[in-house]
Amino acid sequence: MTKILFMGRKRLSANLLRLLSSQNGIEIVGVLTDSHLQGSPTTAAAKELGLPLYTFDTALEAMKEGRLKYDLGLSVLYWRKLRDEFLTIPSLGTINFHPALLPEYKGTGGY
């Protein structure tokens, strides 16, 4: 079973979260999403699926305390630059999906 920390925002992320949560061999151990926005589609999907929600800071704290352990980080349209802990702690690393050319279309709404 691959344990995933899902990081995302927007509708595409929410749809992917729903798809991943239904797959055999995958366990979503937490969802890191927009703590500063009301009505985040990813937050709504996580609540609908009964998945633990984290802010950037609460995820870091849980990782450092050993309460949040995962094999793979998956960032899909996540708005914030990740700190080293998010890249080095998971045994399989972290994958980032950004649907636009970088660096030309960097940022949260560059596509």
Where is each model-derived feature located?
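One-carbon transfer enzymes
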Residues: 1-111
